[in-house]
């Protein structure tokens, strides 16, 4: 069995900082995680909800902050409740934010059972 280590310090920490982080701190954290062989670094959300830049995880912004090669896969999270239209998950909205050319390789999805039935 293969194990992967995922770090969600920034995504989870955003609840305390409204997803605003100092770019130098982010670069130092990512370099440290990468040097310690963390497999996946979850940077924040891709969300239409108001919040700092790590609540949006815009590819251009992330690329400007992380201007160096990272071995780990970069990830973001979406919350299904942000993509519900007429009481149904709007899959086209989700597909629009997941681009093959993205700096992100992984999208994690947070959902409650009743949101995805």
Where are these regions (language model features)?
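Anaerobic metallocofactor- and corrinoid-dependent redox/one-carbon enzyme cores
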Residues: 23-27
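N-terminal glycine-rich anion-binding loops that anchor highly charged ligand groups
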Residues: 2-8, 30-45
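N-terminal small/glycine-rich loop or linker at the start of catalytic domains
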Residues: 1-18, 71-73, 101-102
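Basic, gly/Ser/Thr/Pro-rich low-complexity segments located predominantly at protein N termini
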Residues: 18-19, 49
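Short amphipathic alpha-helices and their capping/turn segments at secondary-structure boundaries
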Residues: 28-34, 63-66
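Conserved, mostly hydrophobic/aromatic
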Residues: 13, 33, 107
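Active-site beta->alpha loop and helix N-cap motifs at the rims of alpha/beta catalytic domains
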Residues: 40, 45-117
């Amino acid at each position: 069995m293969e194990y992967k280590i995922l770090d969600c310090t920034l995504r989870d920490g955003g609840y305390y900082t409204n997803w605003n982080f100092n770019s130098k701190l982010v670069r130092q954290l990512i370099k440290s995680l990468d040097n310690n062989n963390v497999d996946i670094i979850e940077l924040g959300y891709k969300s239409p909800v108001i919040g700092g830049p790590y609540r949006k995880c815009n590819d251009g912004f992330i690329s400007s902050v992380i201007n160096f090669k990272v071995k780990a896969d970069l990830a973001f999270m979406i919350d299904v409740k942000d993509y519900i239209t007429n009481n149904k998950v709007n899959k086209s909205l989700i597909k629009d934010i997941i681009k093959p050319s993205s700096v992100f390789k992984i999208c994690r999805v947070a959902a409650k059972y009743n949101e995805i039935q």
